Amino acid sequence: MITGAHAMIFSKDPDADRLFLRDVLEIPCIDSGGGWLIFALPPAELGVHGGDNGFHQLYFICDDVDAFVAALAAKNVTCGDIEAAPWGRITYVTLPGGGKLGVYEATHARP
């Protein structure tokens, strides 16, 4: 029934964010026409939590958050402090358009 998922990042500077995803995070992409880049995402999982704020969140998962932060530092990109959460160790990257992107090393069981 469901064959995939399509996530959207809304940005004040979408062109800069697209280049960041492609060139800094090295996420493969295709040009679907007119310069509109669609990025390939790795296998994903979906959690549903209680709440009434109507917001959804997007996090990327990495194997080693310390190595991720070091790799971005080598590209002159600063990540937020690594914090412990019940479900993993998380950092945030501020995209060129100003949005924050969470990246975490999962400590929870994964499907």
Residues covered by each model-derived region:
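Vicinal oxygen chelate
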Residues: 9, 69, 73-111
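Helix N-cap motif at beta-to-alpha junctions
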Residues: 13-14, 63-65
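N-terminal beta-strand motif that seeds the catalytic metal site of vicinal oxygen chelate
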Residues: 1-18, 45, 56-58, 107-111
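Short acidic/glycine-enriched loop/turn segments that link adjacent beta-strands
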Residues: 33-36, 54, 85-89
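Active-site beta-strand termini and strand-to-loop segments that position acidic
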Residues: 39-43, 50-51, 93-96, 106
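Short, charged/polar surface micro-motifs in flexible loops or helix N-caps
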Residues: 42-46, 53-54, 64-67
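Core segments of cupin and vicinal oxygen chelate
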Residues: 8-46
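Short amphipathic alpha-helices within nucleic acid-binding modules
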Residues: 20, 66-71
